[in-house]
Amino acid sequence: MPQRESCYFCGAASTSDEHVPPRAVFPKPKDSPDGRDYRRQLIKVPACDAHNSATSKDDEYLLYVATMSLPANSLGTHHFLTKVRRAIEERPALIRSIVKSAQRVHVEDIETGSKFATYAFEVDGARLDAIFEKIARGIHFHETRTRWVGEVVTLVESEMSFEDLEVNHLRESVVKAADRLFSGVPLSGSNPDAFCYQRIAFPDRSLIRLHFYGAVRVVATLAN
């Protein structure tokens, strides 16, 4: 009887396959504006219970935050107005915990120059870091069939600080550097409107740029 592969994250015996990123990110036909099934040809990696089924609440948190993010494309917005809205009606506790910190802000689109009012809210940074770390490790395993045992550092490109403008300037510099670095690197993923990624491999590290709903981007650095 063939043995299952070990967990992509911790190396324990795998008990199932984990979708990378979580399947919840990808709309079913009834939740997509064109009736398309975005759940075809998804990436899967072997995982133990602790790094798959036990993190289902984190999957839902990621879905809420990504679809509510300002850079999300029309698919992400539609997914929020369908699947996420139904979930909110059934289980309102999560959305209440997210929007309790909401602040009305005015933003400017640096590409068009248009200005408009919207809401900003505080996210659970540590929770998102853990979620994106899992995804980055999953992508690494998918690409190499080996488990990454080094460190993973993630940066959400659209995140902003209301208290430290210097942090925002630093983040902006990192995003511009990422734009230059990943320019010309092909996008991978069968459903790019929902999720795709870019990867650059070096001998001792690799960089992965995650794209959710078009422009909700996260840079992950995998280094020893």
For every predicted segment, state its role.
Residues M1-P2:
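N-terminal alpha-helical interaction blocks
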Residues S6-K44, E60-Y61:
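Histidine-centered nuclease catalytic patch
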Residues D34-D49, T77-P92:
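Short Fe-S-cluster ligation motifs
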Residues Q41-V65:
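Short Cys/His-centered divalent metal-binding micro-motifs
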Residues H51, A66-H79:
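A broadly used, surface-exposed interaction patch
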Residues A54-L62, A72, H142, T146:
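Amphipathic alpha-helical interaction segments
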Residues R86-V123:
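Short flanking/linker segments adjacent to small metal-binding domains or redox-active Cys/His motifs
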Residues G113-N224:
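C-terminal, charged low-complexity interaction regions
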